[in-house]
Amino acid sequence: MQAFHSNWTRPFFIRNPHMEYRIEPFELLTTALSALEWRRENGSIRMICDTPAKRYYESLGLCFLWDDGVYPLLDTMPEDINATAFWAAGKLYALSAVPSPCVMLDTDFICWKSISNLLDGPDTAAIHREDIMPSIY
């Protein structure tokens, strides 16, 4: 099944206005493992991001990880979105850009085996729940 990662850099730049964009090495490793394991076990994957993220991945030679391409579609996100409060909004915009059925996969989620049997039938599925943190939400 088609999957996608997403990366919206605006929250990074809001928190770090004078820094060059970067991702911690361990996060790059989990991203690589996530994409490669998904491809091996479940199918194609793409990256939906913005231009700074695409340029960053290109500079590191990592675009090969996403066999279905790297698309800077998040450049069109409205400027009035509060990137501090809604730091994950890029995921929703990415989800709206990918035809269903699809899997929205966090870059730190590694799928070690096929999950096709879990995805046959339901209209929507979630691997896990996340607690709502009042200090964040």
Segments predicted by a language model, with ranges:
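N-terminal anchoring/stem segment of glycosyltransferases
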Residues: 1-78
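A conserved donor-nucleotide-binding helix/loop in the catalytic core
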Residues: 26-28, 33, 76-104
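Glycine-rich loops and low-complexity Gly/Arg-rich segments
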Residues: 30, 71-74, 96, 112, ...
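Short glycine/proline-enriched coil/turn segments at helix->beta-strand junctions
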Residues: 40-44, 97-102, 120-122
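Hydrophobic/aromatic beta-strand patches that form the interior of the parallel beta-sheet core
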Residues: 46-48, 103-105, 124-126
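Short loop/helix-cap segments at secondary-structure boundaries that form the rim of catalytic
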Residues: 56-61, 95, 113-121
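The conserved acidic donor/metal-binding loop of glycosyltransferases
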Residues: 106-110
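Conserved donor-nucleotide/metal-binding helix-loop-beta segment in metal-dependent transferases, i.e.
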Residues: 111-137
